[in-house]
Amino acid sequence: MKFSYAIAAVVAAAASVQAVETNGQRMARGLKPLPPRNIHRRASRTNEARGATPSGTPSGGDYNCNTGSVQCCNQVSKANDTVISAILGLLGIGGVADDVLVGLKCSPLSVVGLGSGNSCSQRPVCCENNSKGGLVSIGCIPITL
């Protein structure tokens, strides 16, 4: 008798299980794949942990350089580059560390006016020392506009 109840339970369970098509079968018919099923219903510690927040958010086009103005430079290299070091020497600029980025032939760039034809085809940077009229800008940081 116990055996017949066990068989009846197995048959009833098998009959109540619905066949779910695989994602491969759905994609073969041109349908989107199903999202993954959550097999474990209780949350784990990683699910309960608070997600990290970004350290900063870009400010919708009003890019502000903390070190100086936005410049568009024809060339940006480290101060130990042979061309850059020669130009710095000719201008009498000394004491620049070898790993500092230096921009050559820089012109001011208005980030607000980028949509109206004011664009930088070379390399946009923020430079802290633009005292040589755009010929040499020292302490540059590359930026993405």
UniProtKB/Swiss-Prot annotation:
Annotated SMART domains: HYDRO (SM00075)
| Keywords assigned by UniProt, alphabetized | Cell wall, Disulfide bond, Glycoprotein, Secreted, Signal
A cellular component term, taken from the record's GO annotations: fungal-type cell wall
Q: Which residues are glycosylated?
A: N80, N129
- What are the protein's GO molecular function terms? structural constituent of cell wall
Q: Could you tell me the superkingdom of the organism this chain comes from?
A: Eukaryota
Residues in the signal sequence: 1-19
Which spans of this chain does the record mark as coiled coil?
Answer: none
Q: A Pfam family matched by this chain, by name?
A: Hydrophobin
Location within or outside the cell: Secreted; Secreted, Cell wall
Give the intrachain disulfide bonds.
C65-C126, C72-C120, C73-C106, C127-C140
What did gene disruption experiments reveal? Impairs the formation of primordia. Inhibits the mycelial growth on various nitrogen sources. Affects the resistance to heat, oxidative, and osmotic stresses.
The record's induction entry says: Expression is negatively regulated by areA, an important transcription factor in nitrogen metabolism that contains a GATA zinc finger-binding domain.
Q: What does this protein do?
A: Aerial growth, conidiation, and dispersal of filamentous fungi in the environment rely upon a capability of their secreting small amphipathic proteins called hydrophobins (HPBs) with low sequence identity. Class I can self-assemble into an outermost layer of rodlet bundles on aerial cell surfaces, conferring cellular hydrophobicity that supports fungal growth, development and dispersal; whereas Class II form highly ordered films at water-air interfaces through intermolecular interactions but contribute nothing to the rodlet structure.
Family, similarity comment: Belongs to the fungal hydrophobin family.
Q: How does it assemble?
A: Self-assembles to form functional amyloid fibrils called rodlets. Self-assembly into fibrillar rodlets occurs spontaneously at hydrophobic:hydrophilic interfaces and the rodlets further associate laterally to form amphipathic monolayers.
UniProt name for this protein: Class I hydrophobin 1
Q: What is the lineage of its organism?
A: Eukaryota, Fungi, Dikarya, Basidiomycota, Agaricomycotina
